[in-house]
From Swiss-Prot:
Contains many negatively charged residues, which are arranged in winding patterns on the surface similar to the charge distribution seen in dsDNA. The secondary structure elements are arranged in an alpha-alpha-beta-beta-beta-beta order with the two alpha helices packed against the same side of an anti-parallel four-stranded beta sheet. This is Putative double-stranded DNA mimic protein HI_1450. Pfam families: DUF440. Monomer in solution. Interacts with the DNA-binding protein HU. Coiled coil: none annotated. It comes from Haemophilus influenzae (strain ATCC 51907 / DSM 11121 / KW20 / Rd). May act as a double-stranded DNA (dsDNA) mimic. Probably regulates the activity of the DNA-binding protein HU. InterPro entries: dsDNA_mimic_put, Put_dsDNA_mimic_sf. Belongs to the putative dsDNA mimic protein family.
């Protein structure tokens, strides 16, 4: 018997990702990127809930079911409202009782 997973709503996933980003960015981003993000976030910043990619296995070395995770990007958007400078991509489990996450940081 399989149990239905209650998926994160986009706003909750965005809040979780942004909180993690703020907590961990200082340890994982170059100081220049942190400065850029802080200076431009108010004008160009974005935190976007996106369709969960199926290539996370290549990034994290673990096969995942895209239906069990939400994907959120944190970065800066350009004049066309496209996120062209991604500082972090988050993969967040929909399982509330066992909330795990993976992050790909800008290199």
């Amino acid at each position: 018997m399989t149990t239905e997973i209650k998926k994160l709503d986009p706003d909750t996933a965005i809040d979780i990702a942004y909180d993690i980003f703020l907590e961990m960015a200082g340890e994982n981003l170059d100081p220049a990127d942190i400065l850029l993000f802080n200076l431009q976030f108010e004008e160009r910043g974005g935190v976007e809930f996106v369709e969960t990619a199926d290539d996370w296995e290549e990034e994290i070395g673990v096969l995942i079911d895209p239906e069990e995770y939400a994907e959120v990007w944190v970065g800066l958007v350009n004049e066309q409202d496209e996120m062209d400078d991604v500082f972090a991509k988050f993969l967040i489990s929909h399982r509330e009782e066992d909330r795990e996450f993976h992050v790909i940081w800008k290199k």
